[in-house]
Swiss-Prot record:
Signal sequence region: none
The protein, known as: 2-aminoethylphosphonate--pyruvate transaminase
Record family assignment: Belongs to the class-V pyridoxal-phosphate-dependent aminotransferase family. PhnW subfamily.
Oligomeric and partner information: Homodimer.
Organism: Bacillus cereus (strain Q1)
Entry EC number(s): 2.6.1.37
HAMAP family: PhnW_aminotrans_5 (MF_01376)
Length: 365
């Protein structure tokens, strides 16, 4: 049990360690040499987490939520005559579509039900039929439900048809092993407050250098200009163009050190996976069924179907909060669900305590 007023069983923001919180008790200057050196170390560590072919990739940090970084990529990477195929089966894929439409980018959608993974056959059919598509985007872990999408197959198809690949790995990077060079991912986006277990305040983009260089002058926004942000960090030793979240960066650096101490991404994945499997098994015992088929389920967050018509999520939420737990409501339209996250500083004992608390307040059957 961590020293928190609530245990956040959510997909980020999430429960952080005491040591991550403690580094935010101090103040730093954005122009300080030591701080900028830390920014450079963070950038390098992220690339090393993403691939062994580190010389081919670089990292750009971007102020704001993860969505800001996604929009920075969409608005900077796709040229005026570009066209994007978006694979969507949840709120975050739909958000990418909305961004493209707001930025007047031509977009095609491959949509599946929220509990079904991206349909590779349909994706290939679209790529065969529409030769104008230049980019393809997919969400790795769609936290709307907790489903994992087949990014290996999507990126393989993307490269087979000569497309630039964009992967929203917001809720998976750092918790699921990904080699972006091996998967031929051109741009991967994630956030400080997800599986690396930092706090909210910035997102990051791990980009193939060759593709990033093509983005100069293409941005549709000043503050979300991915190329300019990178060029400043690259040429001015870690400096951000605009005020950076200094406390958040220090917390993230500490979180990276703690990820290494835990044993890296593989070890963290194992903990998350054990949490998720234990959660599902215990929840089944008291009558709750997961929405997503086991073979498509991520270790990040799990959606559970309301057991009966009389089930009152708000009542359960309030009872759990009194017991020191915070969970998530559902986010899909066709099935009543609620969600429980498995990531953050959460361990087996926490899962047992949570389900015991749920069982105390809910009688099914």
């Amino acid at each position: 049990m961590t020293e928190n007023h609530y245990l956040l069983l959510t997909p980020g923001p999430l429960t952080t360690t005491k040591t991550v919180k403690e580094v935010m008790l101090y103040d730093w200057c954005t122009w300080d040499v030591e701080y900028n050196m830390m920014v450079q170390q963070v950038r390098a560590k992220l690339v090393s987490l993403a691939t062994k072919e580190e010389e081919r990739y670089t990292t750009v940090l971007m102020q704001g939520s993860g969505t800001f970084s996604v929009e920075a990529v969409i608005g900077s990477v796709i040229p005026k005559n570009g066209k994007m195929l978006v694979c969507t089966n949840g709120a975050y894929g739909k958000r990418i579509v909305q961004m493209a439409e707001m930025l007047h980018i031509d977009v095609v959608v491959s949509q599946t039900e929220e509990w079904e993974p991206t349909n590779i056959v349909e994706v290939e059919k679209i790529l065969q039929q529409d030769k104008e598509i230049t980019h393809i985007a997919v969400v790795h872990c769609e936290t709307t439900t907790g489903i994992i999408n087949p990014i290996v197959d999507v990126c393989k198809l993307g490269k087979q048809y000569g497309k630039v690949t964009l992967v929203d790995a917001m809720s998976s990077f750092g918790g699921i092993e990904i080699d972006i060079a091996e998967l031929q991912i051109d741009f991967l986006i994630s956030s400080a407050n997800k599986c690396i277990q930092g706090v909210p305040g910035f997102g990051f983009v791990i980009a193939k250098r060759d593709e990033l260089l093509k983005c100069k002058g293409q941005a549709r926004s000043l503050s979300l200009d991915l190329y300019d942000q990178w060029e400043t960090m690259e040429n001015q030793n870690g400096k951000w163009r605009f005020t950076s979240p200094t406390h958040v960066v220090h917390a993230f650096y500490q979180a990276l050190l703690e990820l290494e101490k835990e044993g890296g991404v593989k070890a963290r994945y194992n903990r998350y996976d054990n949490n998720q499997k234990l959660l599902v098994n215990r929840m089944r015992e008291i009558g709750f069924k997961p929405l997503v088929d086991e073979k498509y389920q991520s270790p990040i967050i799990t959606s559970f179907i309301y057991p009966e018509e009389w089930f009152d999520f708000e009542q359960l939420y309030n009872e759990l909060k009194r017991d020191g737990f915070v969970i998530y409501p559902g986010k899909i339209s066709k099935v009543d669900t609620f969600r429980i996250g498995n990531i953050g500083d959460v361990h087996e004992a926490d899962i047992h305590r949570l389900v015991d608390s749920i069982a105390k307040g809910v009688v099914i059957g």
